[in-house]
């Protein structure tokens, strides 16, 4: 395994011997890459009746067409009567003249069965890297609870019930309600001739973005995306290798409270990593790299080091079986807390388990590389605690400054081209 070191390196020669010319030739052929994604973790408490929702999602790569995937993992069968997608300019407003109708197998409507998933036809639309898209979905049924990702740290919008079908409307005016959950929208694929693939950040609340800033996109993986798209960052697009190979997409598949396995007690309140790997990672298009950043919630729920490690091994083996690279991230410190209700708290024995798992991640695990986030955020005076300026206040999550430093610590060379799913 390689440690994250200097970011300077020489321009490569490809295995074909054609060097960057060959890379550019491959890049110029348009291909579908997942440019945004999220993980569903339950059903919304909001009931929709003859209403329209407008979900806001920031795609991480440019392209000339998109297709949207809608999942209904936790909902009853639902009909989407109409769907539109367009560039968001502010709040819930779509840029004038850009809202495009979405079709599913040629139809403007689609029914998604309980637990089902649908992907739209291609929609011709120019998108930029890190551009916000508004995906509007009309729900004609009554008392519908959406399958959702809660706590998306992004403002989305929906109408009052019985407002009807306003999916084609470009103004925010009818969208009088706000939510920070993501309803039905699972992912957005981008047809790109400049992106070589996608990086999936597979984790818990520290990937999901707890303690980050609403609508600011300041999670650790957001900063990785910014750096990949920056001409200033060493090892980024403007500095040699990456500007020849194109911009990698970064996809956030974090769920607050998520665990690696289901062996902990009390049981996890969302599908653990070993169970959702196919749905939330391997089903995406154009994936080249996976970052596995979990484990703290297993330990909090009384899992042993062996149980966490066995779960990580399972994920590593399955990712590598698809020909993808997998990068491990060390578990950051967690402050002691007494048990309260179903929360089993944290104590020195759990810190010892964390340190044992981290030792395995650093020295024995079959990861292709390691991101040592533990070293980035820990307190120099006490490595079993989060550095006070980097602690958001709960002793569990980084502050925005901590997330920034985590994103800045990532060696972008780790995302060099690899096999693609």
Language-model features: locations:
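Conserved SGNH/GDSL esterase-like catalytic core that processes O-acyl groups on lipids
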Residues: 36, 54, 83-92, 167-168, ...
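Structured segments of extracytoplasmic/periplasmic soluble domains
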Residues: 226-234, 253, 280, 284, ...
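Active-site segments of SGNH/GDSL-like serine hydrolases
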Residues: 293-300, 315-354
């Amino acid at each position: 395994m390689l440690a994250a070191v200097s970011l300077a390196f020489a321009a490569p020669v490809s295995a074909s011997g054609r060097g960057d010319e060959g890379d550019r030739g491959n890049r110029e052929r348009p291909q579908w890459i997942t440019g945004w994604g999220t993980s569903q973790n339950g059903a919304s408490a909001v009931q929709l009746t003859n209403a329209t929702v407008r979900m806001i999602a920031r795609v991480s790569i440019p392209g000339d067409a998109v297709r949207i995937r809608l999942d209904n993992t936790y909902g009853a069968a639902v009909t989407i009567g109409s769907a539109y997608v367009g560039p968001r300019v502010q709040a819930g407003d779509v840029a004038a003249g850009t809202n495009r109708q979405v079709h599913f197998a040629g139809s403007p409507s689609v029914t998604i069965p309980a637990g089902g998933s649908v992907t739209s036809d291609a929609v011709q639309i120019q998108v930029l890297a890190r551009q916000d898209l508004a995906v509007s979905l009309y729900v004609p049924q009554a008392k519908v609870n959406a399958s959702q990702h809660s706590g998306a740290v992004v403002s989305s919008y929906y109408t009052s019930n019985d407002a009807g079908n306003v999916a084609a409307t470009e103004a925010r005016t009818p969208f009088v309600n706000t939510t920070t959950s993501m309803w039905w929208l699972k992912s957005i694929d981008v047809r790109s001739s400049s992106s070589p693939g996608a990086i999936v950040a597979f984790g818990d609340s520290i990937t999901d973005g707890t303690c980050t800033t609403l609508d600011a996109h300041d999670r650790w993986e957001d900063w990785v995306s910014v750096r990949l798209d920056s001409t200033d960052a060493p090892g980024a697009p403007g500095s040699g290798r990456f500007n020849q190979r194109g911009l990698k997409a970064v996809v956030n598949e974090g769920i607050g409270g998520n665990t690696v396995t289901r062996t902990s007690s009390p049981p996890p309140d969302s599908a653990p990593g070993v169970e959702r790997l196919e749905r939330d990672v391997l089903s995406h298009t154009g994936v080249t790299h996976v970052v596995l950043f979990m484990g703290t919630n297993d330990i909090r729920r009384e899992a042993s080091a062996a149980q966490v490690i066995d779960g990580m091994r399972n994920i590593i083996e399955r990712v590598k079986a698809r020909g993808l690279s997998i990068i491990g991230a060390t578990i950051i410190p967690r402050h002691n807390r007494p048990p309260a209700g179903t929360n089993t708290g944290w104590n020195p024995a759990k810190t010892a388990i964390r340190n044992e798992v981290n030792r395995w991640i650093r020295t024995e695990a079959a990861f292709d590389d390691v991101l040592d986030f533990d070293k980035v955020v820990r307190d120099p005076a006490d490595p079993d605690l989060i550095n006070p300026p980097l602690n958001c206040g709960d002793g569990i999550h980084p502050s925005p400054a901590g997330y920034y430093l985590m994103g800045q610590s990532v060696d972008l060379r780790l995302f060099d081209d690899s096999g693609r799913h």
